[in-house]
Amino acid sequence: MQPEIKIKRMKKRVFKILEMTAFQSQQNIIATDYSKTIITPSRLKIENDRLQIEITYYDEGQTITEKSKKYMVTIQLVQLIDPGEFQKYVDGNNRDYDPGSAIQALNIILSKAPTNDPAIIPNGRSKFFVNSDPRPLGKGLVALRGYYSSIRPSISRILCNVNVCMTAFYRETDVATLIYEFTGASPGATIPPNIYGRLGGFLKRLRISTSHIKGPNGKPKVQAKAIIGIGHGRAAKDIKFMCEEFAKEVSIPEYFKRKYNITLRHPNLPCVDVGTRDMPIMLPPEIATVLPGQAYGNKLMDEQTAHMITYACRNPKENAGFIVGEGLTSLGLNPPTPHLGPFNIQVSTEMITVPARILTPPTIKYANSTMAVIGASWNLRNVKFAQGASTENFGVIVLEETGGRAQLDWSGVAANFRDMCNKSGMRVGATSPQLMRAVSIPYPNERSTASLEKAISPAFAHMQAKKPKIILVFLPTTDKAVYSMVKYLGDVKYGISTVCAQSSKISKMSPQYMANVALKFNLKLMGRNHGLPPADLGMLAEGTTMIVGCDVTHPSPGSLRGTPSIAGVVASVDAHFAQWPASLRLQESRKEMISGLKEMMIERLQRWNSVNGKFPQRIIVYRDGVSEGQFQTVIKEELPLIRAACQQCGDSKYRPKISIIIVGKRHHTRFYPTDKDKADRLGNPAPGTVVDRGVTAVYDFDFYLQAHSGLQGTTRPAHYYVIHDKNDFKSNQLQTLTHNLCYLFGRATKSVSICPPAYYADLVCERGRCYIYGLLNAPDTASLHSSNSEEEAAANFKKAVGLWGDGPHPNLLNTMYYL
């Protein structure tokens, strides 16, 4: 396509114009991704399999003018896909065949119906949303229910994976109403200028339509524009400019009244800029209407997230009903749409049935008892930790919001917690805590990274002088900015482990809540909460295996350009698999593979050696955060780094047996029990359910394991995919080992959804995000007219490196500070 188009919306429009012109007579027998690929059931009758077409671009609802831009589109044959070869692949007769193109083609064909249905909103290549039942999320957003669809090859059959999904969209209304909803201001109120930055970020790239300008025929001319920011940081009534047409300086309201006979109802609102950096165009928001079907790409606020979870939470029966009912209809699969016929595609409208097994839960051991597991959980009543940690004293910091509630007896609360620790088998000094500090933190609208550090840091400095092993911090709010500052100060700046508790909860002195906080206390002081008997550890009981968890977390929407990704590696060190110290690094933004893996593995191997007096004979790696398309990259890039770390640590003959298992948790496979006796109270599969046939890979070893019991809604199993295995695991052996590990998550009294090494790796990466919180959550003044320059990205990366320093303090490197 020449000239090149980078904007997806425009590229899609070019393909739409092609469908209506060059391919008008063939619309029913072609499918496209509206980006660069066209799929046809047979070869097009064009000379030399190549065709060049000039098209004139115009937006939907507009007409071609003399200024309309022209594009040269080249269509050429790039590949012939043989369905027979794909069938041989799924039948197990052609392992060397690459199914990628066939899968892509089938996905494009299946997406044609929902993509072209005016009642459906496509979002990405595989999600399609129904625009008939919007649920309010607040702050100008709504949640829409949609359906995910993707082709999955399995043994002897090709499957279509369908699942329900929900996403936030901008509410379809005028932009003035949207502004009032987002800011929480009453209609007619003035918006404080200090909110303009955040408002601009919310509106940036939002597409709107206007109709205040009349065309040659005298009728309103509908124009589509994109908002690039907030205009001039002032209300419309306060903006004046020299108008050549009226030969005088006029305000925005005066101009629209004289030019278009429009009296602005909200002159106190800021204008939206729909121009460019060099040539801004200001529009009063009340004359702009949000175009439908625009997904919100930034991070939701806590309250919005809570609403989203409520809407998305459906029991298994209801979830399955949506899929086979509204889902298949929305996707054009039931009844099947005509476009499937030319491709000779038929999709069954019934869910497939697959075999499953339920693994037996392990025995949970404490110092004084074994616990019965019921529904994948147990309680802490009258038990002592398997190995209680000791400390003569601990510090307490009480954070209070300025003007907050009256002072409670925090010394009494802390003493109650001390007693709970001792009751649970820890040894905490009878006079603890001797160190207590109360700290007032700024009001929410006055909080910044700098103001929070200024308020809280002196308390840590005071504590550091007294050298407590650990500090208990009472938080007055769930504000992540406050939590992140506490963790930054404790982990990075002062090197003191911290445990946070919500003031509103711990002040009630509930034994259950106190006991749960004590779980973290004991682990961070290098104790052991519970364990499994040797029989349930299997080969792990030999004491020669190090289990590793790896993950990478990337900047979230709203982060400043160039903000680094964070890589984390955790590894077991003891025979009970209770302690998992970690290595943590910044790396290039959005890089999937772990750059510093060799050095991080060396740190983990050296720590294992210092505890055990030898290096492990086996290494089992659970790698989180990797998509299917990157499995081979892990083998090619990360496996050699692990081997190199081993060679550097041991002698020349040191060659531990390495296995790498990818942990998938963001997939769309769900299971619905056919037998009520094999279901839990919600109708989900019983904890311990494992599926390794029917929906798994054709040639490789993978399985789905639901080790946990869901609290609500439809549970999602973890997907484990073995990409390298020199330990020669039998399928049941690895499944049982992974399942039993899920009962060893130290800070819970239940089995967890993914095995602890992957879970801990995720947690340590999340902890790293606290250290660069300000970059990951850009302030209101973040550039709205960003140049997206490499210089800007480099500056932000450098700032992150400065905040990060050397990362977690040396005092904490051998502890589970990240819990």
Predicted region positions:
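Long, low-complexity, intrinsically disordered terminal regions
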Residues: 1-819
